[in-house]
UniProtKB/Swiss-Prot annotation:
One of its GO terms (cellular component) is plasma membrane. It is a multi-pass membrane protein. It is found in: Cell inner membrane. It comes from Rhodopseudomonas palustris (strain TIE-1). This is UPF0060 membrane protein Rpal_4363. The keyword Glycoprotein does not apply. Belongs to the UPF0060 family.
Length: 110
């Protein structure tokens, strides 16, 4: 459960950081947006190191499902773009995959 909360916090930081660059380059916002954006991206990277996984690749793969669902929620909450049925179905598939990776039974290391 700790990893799930960590992944949610990491997703918020990654999306916030990336959106700062989007706002600067695509929405003509001030380059000052990059300061909190880069801080958010650094916090995102740190948060991923807190995942309850001995393997970085597995942690990143599991995180991907949370990221996808979070990005769609961001689009709805911040940009006003409500996810359609295909967005929801796609995110649900990703969350199932994330659950298999994160919660699937694992053999104990030898």
């Amino acid at each position: 459960m700790t990893s799930l909360l960590t992944f949610c916090a990491a997703a918020l930081m990654e999306i916030t950081g990336c959106f700062a660059f989007w706002a600067w380059l695509r929405l003509d916002k001030s380059p000052l947006w990059l300061i909190p954006g880069m801080l958010a991206l650094a916090l995102f990277a740190y948060l991923l190191t807190l995942a309850d996984s001995p393997l970085a690749g597995r942690a990143y793969a599991a995180y991907g499902g949370i990221y996808i669902a979070s990005a769609l929620l961001w689009g709805w909450a911040i940009e006003g773009n409500r996810p359609d049925q295909w967005d929801v179905i796609g995110a649900a598939i990703c969350l199932v995959g994330m659950s298999v990776i994160l919660f699937g039974p694992r053999a104990l290391p030898a």
